[in-house]
């Protein structure tokens, strides 16, 4: 497919066409996913769980993220590569900049940071220095111990109000994209309308500008055996992985995925 850039993603939002994203950790799947038309490949710190077998993303290091980003780059055929900054890799803006540089040198086009309004200073510094940032809000797995587990965020009105304000603040600080995880569908829709940058959802309903899933989840592979509510197994009824990836792209584009049963209410 033609090379996907940040401008491409903003254009898709402007046209009302959904953006497709999947996690990806190696060259083989990068080639398969990009050939299927997946526009954004997320080198997620979820690799700590699905590849390394940890029970959280916390043990993943920046060096490991750079290694997998480089692998994805070698197989990619035109998708935009988004890489996660792992746990405690952005404790200060300066530390964040150094670690972002490592990931971008490995092949990332954009960096994803987990957090809320407190990230504004860091995002502003990164944006000023040429690092496009995707801010990850809602359920942020790196803070799972503070959140008390993997729970839907934003169900209480005060929390929802704060999340809306934080999204606007992060866009104003220079965030180029938002990712909302496990957020009530109605709240995700409101945030998507409140900002001009693309908003990607996972467990956030179908009114966001695009969708992302963990690659292994949508292929029916689960190390733990637990399948999140927002996941659909796209291998069902498909002859091969390439067909499953293409089915995911089609379902996101025609808004048949996610369906109502994949989302959360307030």
Curated annotation (Swiss-Prot):
GO cellular component, one term: cytoplasm
Binding sites annotated in the UniProt record for Mg(2+): 45, 84, 114
Cellular localization per UniProt: Cytoplasm
This enzyme's EC code(s): 2.1.2.11
The keyword Cytoplasm belongs to this UniProt entry's keyword annotation: yes
Cofactor requirement: Mg(2+)
Active-site residues, record numbering mapped to chain: 181 (proton acceptor)
GO molecular function: 3-methyl-2-oxobutanoate hydroxymethyltransferase activity; magnesium ion binding
Catalytic class of the enzyme: transferase
Biological process terms in GO annotation: pantothenate biosynthetic process
Cofactor annotation remark: Binds 1 Mg(2+) ion per subunit.
UniProt main location, coarse: cytoplasm
Pfam families per record: Pantoate_transf
Family named by the database record: Belongs to the PanB family.
Function as written in the Swiss-Prot or TrEMBL entry: Catalyzes the reversible reaction in which hydroxymethyl group from 5,10-methylenetetrahydrofolate is transferred onto alpha-ketoisovalerate to form ketopantoate.
Name of protein: 3-methyl-2-oxobutanoate hydroxymethyltransferase
């Amino acid at each position: 497919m033609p090379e996907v850039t940040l401008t491409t993603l903003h254009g898709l939002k402007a046209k009302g066409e959904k953006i497709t994203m999947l996690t990806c950790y190696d060259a083989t799947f990068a080639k398969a996913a990009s050939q299927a038309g997946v526009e954004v490949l997320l080198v997620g710190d979820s690799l700590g769980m699905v590849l390394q077998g940890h029970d959280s993303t916390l043990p993943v290091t920046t060096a490991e993220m750079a290694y997998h980003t480089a692998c994805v780059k070698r197989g990619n055929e035109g998708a935009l590569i988004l890489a996660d900054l792992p746990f405690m890799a952005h404790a200060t803006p300066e530390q964040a900049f150094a670690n972002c540089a490592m990931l971008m040198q490995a092949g990332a086009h954009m960096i994803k940071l987990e957090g809320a309004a407190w990230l504004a200073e860091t995002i502003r510094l990164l944006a000023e220095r040429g690092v496009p940032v995707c801010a990850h809000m809602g359920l942020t797995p790196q803070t799972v111990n503070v959140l008390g587990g993997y729970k839907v965020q934003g169900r209480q009105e005060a929390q929802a109000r704060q999340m809306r304000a934080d999204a606007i603040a992060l866009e104003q600080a220079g965030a180029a994209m938002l990712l909302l995880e496990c957020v009530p569908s109605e709240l995700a829709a409101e945030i998507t309308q409140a900002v001009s940058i693309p908003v990607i959802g996972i467990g956030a309903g179908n009114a966001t500008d695009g969708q992302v899933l963990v690659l292994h989840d949508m292929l029916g592979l689960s190390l733990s055996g637990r399948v999140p509510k927002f996941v659909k197994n796209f291998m069902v009824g498909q002859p091969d992985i390439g067909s499953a990836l293409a089915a995911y792209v089609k379902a996101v584009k025609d808004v048949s995925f996610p369906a109502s049963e994949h989302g959360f209410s307030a």
